[in-house]
UniProtKB/Swiss-Prot annotation:
Sorted UniProt keywords: ATP-binding, Chaperone, Nucleotide-binding, Phosphoprotein, Stress response
Name of the protein: Chaperone protein DnaK
PANTHER family, per database record: HEAT SHOCK PROTEIN 70KDA (PTHR19375)
Gene3D superfamilies, A to Z: 1.20.1270.10, 3.30.420.40, Actin, Chain A, domain 4 (3.90.640.10), Substrate Binding Domain Of DNAk, Chain A, domain 1 (2.60.34.10)
Its biological purpose: Acts as a chaperone.
Gene it is expressed from: dnaK
Length: 636
């Protein structure tokens, strides 16, 4: 069996590693570097360049040099992040026919996985050159907060590159594997703070060692899929553009060539300011006007850079608090803090993290290589090369379906260990309902519309039955890659529908954070909404039952009683159209009072009929949840 290689497919740089005996080894590419810039260029003569060669020619070919593609993978064109990148990137971001964010290069439409595949091909070739044999299998890492669409798109990129992706694993988890495997760490709880080129993750991970077997269990994860070194670069670039404009009265944003030179200079200055207190951004002949050439020479201090990016660093602190809270731990429970990602070399980032956790982060983990090493370790586990290691990862957000009253009913809660499978039985909302719509949601809010829609499908051909009698079993199955499969089965007929959720629109981090923040800020509003839905459902049940009893009673019920009941029902139905819980409760009570005689008659009939009704009701399964489907008619 061939090697399963480990690939860290990064926003800014990528890295490949393999298991060499019991140790993971990071491989050098054809240029002799251990990391490869995630940059792809399409030249005028039809050549595709990847890595350092692509980076070197970027200044002369800015429109056809693509970088930070990971920020677009699995995203919709209308996503806020894609729109933001569209305005600042030198290359052209367009809407695909299905609404995804794609790119246009030399008049040709290209999907982000197609472009990322070029980087993966280079990683594959690097491993093949070292091993002297073909490589067909890989473990690829993704940010822990990547959603279904982004994970699926990453797998697609692997397939395009000629790799069978054996497992998608989360970057902080991979870093924990790299840290924990070769150290006699015993039982420890660690925090992995991963601030890379385009994404940010925090994971709280417990490492347990029992009889020589190490278990890496993720307790909680959080993050921001659109926060990273690229944003830090953008802040510095904007500052330099504004300073040059003040000094020379010219806006460099209109000159793609100048902006590409500026991008390189800003990235270099940012890196230098991690070790120096000040640096010069010196770009002669940056542009020209009628009076002649213009030169840029601007001094940038570390303090200035820190003031430009302070809010970005602070944005990474809030997810730390949420992750600890979700794990049920306090700062004092964390024994080690590991920094991953090139941006964590910035002293300000290190200080903020140290201040938050009350301890210095470890310096013995290489922030650029740890993730690829962890991916190689996981590859070794899958191929059997590495024994006595068990990895337990989690899903970052709750997953559920929409049930009657517009409620989100979770089937799998956030931070559940994966792979996992959960089934729940639901029923129909109307008599003789022949179809139900399974609307799959992701998020933390009670109201369905406040969560992210992942997709929906219909289960039709349901056997005609009174409301509440049909048994619809919904199963959520998350595989080890964190990809969701949903099925719905009519237990009476055995009819089943399945889908793999391939959300064409991915959840972005800001939406996720907003959901979590909203869930906390609106806990009271959610509680009231839940109570209102319960009151509505009880009233609805009462109307349905009363109407049925009226039909059965026929002429046996005095006319004045029948009129009073019908009036009370009308009043309750009118109240149900509003949002006033107290009003619905009052009208429900009024209907209960006037339908007393009807209830007596129904009880007498039941007594006369003996225990038959009891027998049929007993057949209903115990685990049926009191939440029902309404059929959603597809918009034509």
């Amino acid at each position: 069996m061939g090697k399963i290689i480990g690939i860290d497919l990064g926003t800014t740089n990528s890295c490949v590693a393999i298991m060499d005996g019991t140790k993971a080894r990071v491989l050098e590419n054809s240029e002799g570097d251990r990391t490869t810039p995630s940059i792809i260029a399409y030249t005028q003569d039809g050549e595709t360049l990847v890595g350092q060669p692509a980076k070197r020619q970027a200044v002369t070919n800015p429109q056809n040099t693509l970088f930070a593609i990971k920020r677009l993978i699995g995203r919709r064109f209308q996503d806020e992040e894609a729109q933001r990148d569209k305005d600042i990137m030198p290359y052209k971001i367009i809407a695909a026919d299905n609404g995804d964010a794609w790119l246009e290069v030399k008049g040709q439409k290209m999907a982000p996985p197609q472009i990322s595949a070029e980087v993966l091909k280079k990683m594959k070739k690097t491993a093949e050159d070292y091993l002297g044999e073909p490589v067909t299998e890989a473990v690829i890492t993704v940010p822990a907060y990547f959603n279904d669409a982004q994970r699926q798109a990453t797998k697609d990129a692997g397939r395009i590159a000629g790799l069978e992706v054996k497992r998608i694993i989360n970057e902080p988890t991979a870093a924990a594997l790299a840290y924990g495997l070769d150290k006699e760490v015993g039982n420890r709880t660690i925090a992995v703070y991963d601030l890379g080129g385009g994404t940010f993750d925090i994971s709280i991970i417990e490492i347990d060692e029992v009889d020589g077997e190490k278990t890496f269990e993720v307790l909680a994860t959080n993050g921001d899929t659109h926060l990273g070194g690229e944003d830090f670069d953008s802040r510095l670039i904007n500052y330099l553009v504004e300073e040059f404009k003040k000094d020379q009265g010219m806006d460099l944003r209109t000159d793609p060539l100048a902006m590409q030179r500026l991008k390189e200079a800003a990235e270099k200055a940012k890196i230098e300011l991690s070790s120096a207190q000040q640096t010069d951004v010196n770009l002669p002949y940056i542009t020209a006007d009628g009076s002649g050439p213009k030169h840029m020479n601007i001094k940038v201090t570390r303090a200035k850079l820190e003031s430009l990016v302070e809010d970005l660093v602070n944005r990474s602190i809030e997810p730390l608090k949420v992750a600890l809270q979700d794990a049920g731990l306090s700062v004092s429970d964390i024994q080690d803090v590991i920094l991953v990602g090139g941006q964590t070399r910035m002293p300000m980032v290190q200080k903020k993290v140290a201040d938050f956790f009350g301890k210095e982060p470890r310096k013995d983990v290489n922030p650029d290589e740890a993730v690829a090493i962890g991916a190689a370790v996981q590859g070794g586990v899958l191929s059997g090369e590495v024994k006595d290691v068990l990895l337990l990862d989690v899903t970052p957000l709750s997953l559920g379906i929409e049930t009657m009253g517009g409620v989100m009913t979770p089937l799998i809660t956030k931070n559940t260990t994966i792979p996992t499978k959960h089934s729940q039985v639901f029923s129909t909302a109307e008599d003789n309902q022949s179809a139900v719509t399974i609307h799959v949601l992701q998020g933390e809010r009670k109201r369905a519309q406040d969560n992210k829609s992942l997709g929906q499908f219909n289960l039709d051909g349901i056997q005609a039955a009174p409301r509440g009698m049909a048994q619809i079993e919904v199963t959520f199955d998350i595989d080890a890659d964190g990809i969701l499969h949903v099925s719905a089965k009519d237990k009476n007929t055995g009819r089943e529908q399945k889908i793999t959720i391939k959300a064409s629109s991915g959840l972005n981090e800001e939406e996720i954070q907003k959901m979590v923040r909203d869930a906390e800020a609106n806990a009271e509003a959610d509680r009231k909404f839940e109570e209102l839905v319960q009151t509505r459902n009880q009233a609805d049940h009462l109307i349905h039952g009363t109407r049925k009893q009226l039909e059965e009673a026929g002429d046996k019920l005095p006319a004045e009683d029948k009129t009073a009941i019908e009036e009370a029902m009308k009043g309750l139905e009118a109240a149900l159209k509003g949002e006033d819980k107290a009003e619905i409760e009052a009208k429900t009570q009024a209907l209960v009072q006037v339908s007393g005689k009807l209830l007596e008659m129904a009880q007498q009939q039941q007594a006369a009929a003996g225990g038959d009704a009891g027998d049929t009701s007993a057949k209903k399964e115990d685990d049926v949840v009191d939440a029902e489907f309404e059929e959603v008619k597809d918009k034509k």
